[in-house]
Amino acid sequence: MQTLFFTMFTAYGLGSLAALLEGRKSFKSLGRGLVALGATAGAGAGLALGAIVIATGVPFALSFPELLPLGGGLALRLDSLGAFFLIVIGVGAIPAALYGAGYTATYEDGRASLRLLGLMFNLFLLTMSLVTLADNVLTFLLMW
């Protein structure tokens, strides 16, 4: 389960970084594709993580007490309720990422900042997924 969590985190992070490639003319289509790939891979990993937690009934927990020690540390825990919402996020994010890759092609002429859109899309999906894993108040507020 830890591998799926880190895959989700890394995929969303790489999708966000790929958005920065979109500013160069030679990488516009590649950048859009990588943004969609990062979002799809991250959502798929989150979907799988949620499905495993629901299927097994075993919660996933990860704690970093040395980070933010005053608030009890950064604590992540995924129980059955959080897993349900992580699945809902994944089910909505995958088609949104795939549709968005084609939809944003019409905005390559510079009318809108596709770099910002791709960056914010992946970061939004990451933080929305991490909110479902928050195990204490400080972690919840940080992810919110």
Where are these regions (language model features)?
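Transmembrane helix-loop-helix hairpins at membrane boundaries of multipass inner-membrane proteins
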Residues: 1-6, 17-119
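A generic hydrophobic-helix recognition signal that picks specific residues
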Residues: 5, 72, 129, 138-141
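Functional transmembrane alpha-helices
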Residues: 12, 79, 121, 131-132, ...
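Hydrophobic alpha-helical transmembrane segments
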Residues: 19-23, 127-133
